[in-house]
Structure formats: C-alpha cells, structure tokens
C-alpha cells in the first residue's frame, strides 16, 4: 500500500490545556511521520478561508471564532492509509460518542472543543495541507 498524507490540527482547546505533546507522541506511536509542523495563530479571515465550505451553516461563526481565539498546531502527517487511520485514532467528532482511548475521548470536551481536526478524504487532505504549507515546507517521502 502506498504512503498517504493527511492534515492534523491540534485545536485551541487542546493547545490551551498543554496536551499537544501527548497528542503528537500518540500519533507517532500510531505510525505517523510528521512531514511538516508549525504553530500558528489564525486570523479570523484565515479561519474563514480554511472552513469556507461551512460558510452559511449555523455553526460557522462559532467555529471561526474558536479556531482564531488562540494558537493551533498544524501538521502534515504521512503513513499508509493516513486519512482513514487518523480518523480511527482521533475518534468520533463528539467526544461523548468516541471510542475509549481515542484522542477525542481523551482530550475533547464537546463537539466544538474536540481537540483535533482531521481531513475526511485524501483529496481534502491535499487541499488542506496546501492551505497551510508551501510545497517546500513539507519533507519529501522516503524512498526505498
């Protein structure tokens, strides 16, 4: 199976609780390689741009306000079947419904403050990684 990439965001709630290190360590234990990483504080306009597909939905303003309230940690991660595996490791969007041991179950508080964001499919991952990282910022894949 070929290597795949996905975007991970450690959201403001998890950053404020100083759980980013534990989350990154867990992702590495699960076989993800960090290909790019940066800590940034999104402006409201940047958050609106990233979540543009949700514009017009009832939760959009609250989401944008939350994501721009304090720094986040964005990462381009790589492994086989990265998107699906990441979704499995982070768990359901609602921490109350997430499986035991998943990142959202361990570190999330509610549907809005659920610790992490993850791409939902490979095409989305490519777009999301490009939103945060210029091509030269992402380490190339290892060759055999």
From Swiss-Prot:
Q: Which residues form a coiled coil?
A: none
Q: Provide the binding site for ATP.
A: 11, 59, 87, 93, 104, 114
> Where would one find the signal peptide in this protein?
none
- GO BP: CTP biosynthetic process; GTP biosynthetic process; UTP biosynthetic process
Is Transferase one of the keywords UniProt gives this record?
yes
Molecular function terms, GO-annotated: ATP binding; metal ion binding; nucleoside diphosphate kinase activity
* A Pfam family: NDK
Q: Where is the active site?
A: 117 (pros-phosphohistidine intermediate)
Keywords associated with the record: ATP-binding, Cytoplasm, Kinase, Magnesium, Metal-binding, Nucleotide metabolism, Nucleotide-binding, Phosphoprotein, Transferase
Q: According to its UniProt record, which cofactors does this protein need?
A: Mg(2+)
Enumerate the subcellular locations listed in this protein's record, separating them with semicolons: Cytoplasm
Q: By its UniProt entry, which SMART domains does this protein fall under?
A: NDK (SM00562)
Query: For this protein, what is the EC number?
Result: 2.7.4.6
- Catalysis performed (reactions): a 2'-deoxyribonucleoside 5'-diphosphate + ATP = a 2'-deoxyribonucleoside 5'-triphosphate + ADP; a ribonucleoside 5'-diphosphate + ATP = a ribonucleoside 5'-triphosphate + ADP
Q: What GO cellular component is one of the record's annotations?
A: cytoplasm
The organism's place on the tree of life at top rank = Bacteria
Instruction: Just give the chief location class.
Output: cytoplasm
Give a short account of what the protein does: Major role in the synthesis of nucleoside triphosphates other than ATP. The ATP gamma phosphate is transferred to the NDP beta phosphate via a ping-pong mechanism, using a phosphorylated active-site intermediate.
Question: How is this protein organized at the quaternary level?
Answer: Homotetramer.
Name the family the entry cites: Belongs to the NDK family.
Full protein name: Nucleoside diphosphate kinase
Species for this entry: Sorangium cellulosum (strain So ce56)
